[in-house]
Design a protein with these regions (language model features):
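Short consensus segments that form the blades of beta-propeller domains
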Residues: 18-20
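Compact nucleic-acid interaction/catalytic patches
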Residues: 22-23, 29-62
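C-terminal terminal-subdomain/extension
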Residues: 64-109
Length: 109
């Protein structure tokens, strides 16, 4: 698809954790290591109440957006070949990117 940057919200066809099927889902680019696939954070519209979830509202986007309020799930990080990303839905504002990054750091330290 192209080059992505930290803070981009992308749409990709992702496998369920048991690999039984695939579903088109949003994800947040949280890192773009040089020479490697981008690291993504799963986004869901389900409000689970996990202590690490970060609410993403329509007003949190600098450009583009998602149809409904959603949660970034820092406990679900993965790398993905950018060729399987369907499109970029938008880019989060810097303060929301910092909030998600802080939750990732909190989770792993």
């Amino acid at each position: 698809m192209g080059v992505f940057a930290k803070g981009d919200v992308v749409i990709a066809s992702l496998s369920y954790s048991d690999f039984s099927r695939r579903k088109r889902r949003p994800a947040l680019v949280v890192a773009t290591p040089k020479g490697l696939d981008p690291v993504l954070c799963l986004i869901t519209s389900k409000m689970r109440g996990d202590e690490y979830d970060v609410l993403i509202k329509k007003t949190d986007f600098a450009t583009g957006g998602l149809r409904r309020n959603s949660n970034a799930r820092p406990c679900h990080l993965f790398s993905l070949d950018p060729r399987v990303i369907d499109y970029k839905a938008g880019t989060l504002k810097p303060e929301k990117i910092k909030e998600v990054t802080a939750k990732i750091v909190e989770m792993v330290t």
